[in-house]
Amino acid sequence: MHFVLVHGAYHGAWCWDALRQELEAAGNQTTAMDLPNEDPEAGAGRYAEVVLSAMPRDASNVVVVGHSLGGLTIPLVAATAMPLGIVFLCGLVPVPGKSFDDQHNDLDSGFTSSRPPVGHPDGSASWPEEGAMETFFQDCSPEVARAAARRLTRQHWQATHEVTPLRSWGAVPAAYILCTDDRALPVAYCRHAARDLLGIEPIELPGGHSPFLSRPRLLAEVLGSIYVAQQ
């Protein structure tokens, strides 16, 4: 089994390190990559190109996992590579014909913007260290939370401003994992995305927005169980 791990906004491939150790200890292969967070012109299509260039050409045993903003990218990857499955982890789900900003404006599910209060003249955004610790990493150890917060980058938002390049949903099976104490992406949105957009019941885990750091073993077990269920 080969898990291709697609990080969310502000993060990088580093955020998956603990989860990769757990997945590989269970006999799986993993791939992670850095997406061009700081490129103002990079949208979901560009992100998908980066993912596709990093993953195996034969995707028949690949599951692509997209965290948070990475959820806007993984259906595009699936449309090209036809992996075994895709997993949205506390993820945004695109709607063909709309931008995610349009989705946000249309929702009445309690969604509030998860963007940080610090904006920059170039249109990017960034998180103050303490705010990131409280929002993304509140259930991690203080050492892990602070180290992660210090590695966050600026983020540009072309991927949410643009109309998604996804034209329609394909046949690749999807799963959705939400975290019940998520402070970055409201649980109401996650349930709406899973049930109303994907037509599936979400898998619910305890904890905050970053289970790959706070509960990597549990997350690895859940990802493995989804794979078994799809076989």
Please describe what each predicted stretch is.
Residues D34-E38, L92, G208:
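Short beta-to-alpha linker loops that shape the active-site pocket of alpha/beta-hydrolase fold enzymes
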Residues V65-G70, I74:
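Gly/Ala-rich beta-loop-alpha elbow adjacent to hydrolase catalytic centers
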Residues Q29-V63, V77-A79, F100-S109:
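Active-site loop/oxyanion-hole signature of alpha/beta-hydrolase fold enzymes
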